[in-house]
Amino acid sequence: SFFRTERVQRMKKVFDNEVILPEVARLIEQGHSVTIPVRGNSMNPFLADGRDRVTLGGFIPEELQTGVTVLAKDAEGRFVLHRIIARRDDRLILQGDGNLRQTEETTPAQVAGKVIAVIRKGKRYAAGGVLWRTYSYCWVRLAPCRRYLLALYRRL
């Protein structure tokens, strides 16, 4: 028949972070926003591998405040998607939500982009929205209790 129903299968390509993230940084620098899947478990419980995607976009330095999640190069030149937990002079201290002690230091110049939205189960949540900002604020402030909260989360 003239019209034919074909099953179209969406191809999924997986690239190493070392390959894709420099390109993501370049696109953001050119003014684009880029959506990528979350990989790894360092941002649990708020961002989960295989469940969530984040949209990254540009920023102005004044937006790099405590609680904001950014894609940045650490001191070893690796890209990390972590939350800013403190600012010290011209340094940003980053930590994954699922990390209890490990932190990274970077500078605003090493930040490639900030998370502007989180996509979970097809629904988009603005990272600048009240709900997401409240979660971020509380999580950063709950650092002394985080060990117990993460243990509880991992048992669920």
Predicted feature locations:
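Short, Lys/Arg-enriched N-terminal segments with co-localized hydrophobic residues
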Residues: 1-10
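Extracytoplasmic/periplasmic terminal helices and flexible tails
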Residues: 7, 113-156
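Feature for secretory/organellar precursors and membrane-associated catalytic proteins
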Residues: 12-100
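Short, surface-exposed, charged/polar-biased interaction segments
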Residues: 45, 49, 59, 64, ...
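Short alpha-helical interface elements
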Residues: 49-53, 75, 95, 109, ...
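Generic recognition of short, well-ordered alpha-helical interface segments
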Residues: 79, 106, 110, 144-147
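Aromatic- and Lys/Arg-enriched surface recognition patch
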Residues: 87-132
